[in-house]
Regions:
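Active-site and donor-binding regions of nucleotide-sugar-utilizing enzymes
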Residues: 2-174, 184-199, 206, 210, ...
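Proline/glycine-enriched tight loop/beta-turn segments at coil->beta junctions
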Residues: 177-178
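Glycine/small-residue-rich hydrophobic helix-like segments
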Residues: 216-218, 225-226
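Short acidic alpha-helix that forms the nucleotide-activated donor recognition element
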Residues: 245-252
Length: 252
């Protein structure tokens, strides 16, 4: 039985990686998956040895504070990877962390694949040398990326964005926009939400005080309990917190 290690460093990557794992298991039902992920990968059948929620950080000060935790996690990943010896490692987004995981896997002789590689065509192009050295093949979700990576001698495939298949487009097209409804998207990182949502609430209060005919809907990330969000929101400002599974309907 083949075993892959999927390393998703962000909750958004966890969602993408879950779609990838589901597709892989349709082709190889006996495929085992271990690694780092969140609730979506867990539902897709991965045994999460490390939780992605413990890694997500925002801002330079929080990054510095989280550095010892990240280094400790990398040490544990190296130990588990050496013990379990997966057949392949699939990295998902989050280059600041996953580049270090790539070095670990490469040092152990485990082939490394990158799903949703960093946008080095936009900035810090020199990072392509890292991919040339440590990554066996890239799987891109943007159609123009393969030409860029191929030009630099990196093996690459364009596989499309799996999230597109998750959206029920015919049903979404039936939804009529609601005049005056304002959608709020504070993110999925704890510090990010704690910083942004109270400010969103202040702005919402100003709009209501001005007599605007508006309502507010906040898109809740899967890792954010509604009670946590309500504690950050002004109690005198009405708001609806939409469940994560309703996000596309709410955005439409």
């Amino acid at each position: 039985m083949k075993t892959i290690w999927i390393n998703a460093g962000e909750l958004s990557g966890d969602m993408q990686a879950a779609a990838l794992l589901t597709a892989l298991r349709e082709r190889e039902p006996e495929l085992a998956a271990i690694g780092m992920g969140g609730p979506n990968l867990a539902r897709a059948g991965q045994k999460n040895l490390f939780r992605v929620e413990s890694l997500s950080v925002m801002g330079i000060m929080e990054v510095l504070t989280a550095l010892p935790r990240a280094l400790h996690m990398l040490s544990r990943i190296k130990k588990e990877m050496a013990r379990l010896r997966p057949d392949a490692v699939v990295l998902v987004d989050a280059p600041e962390f996953n580049f270090r995981v790539a070095k670990i896997a490469h040092g152990l002789g485990i082939p490394v694949y990158y799903f949703i590689p960093p946008k080095i065509w936009a900035w810090r192009t020199g990072r392509v040398r890292f991919l040339q050295r440590y990554v066996k093949r890239l799987f891109c979700i943007l159609p123009f990326e393969p030409a860029f990576y191929a030009k630099h001698g990196v093996q690459v495939d364009y596989i499309g964005n799996p999230l597109v298949d998750m959206v029920n487009w015919p049903e979404l097209k039936k939804i009529e926009p609601i005049k005056g409804r304002i959608g709020l998207m504070p993110g999925s990182r704890r510090k990010e939400v704690e910083a942004l949502l109270p400010e969103f609430g202040k702005a919402a209060r100003i709009l209501l005080q001005q007599g605007r005919d508006v309502t507010f809907h906040c898109l809740r990330a899967p890792n954010m309990p509604e009670e946590k969000l309500r504690a950050l929101w002004p109690s005198d400002v009405p708001v609806a917190f939409d469940a994560p599974e309703d996000r596309y309907t709410a955005m439409r």
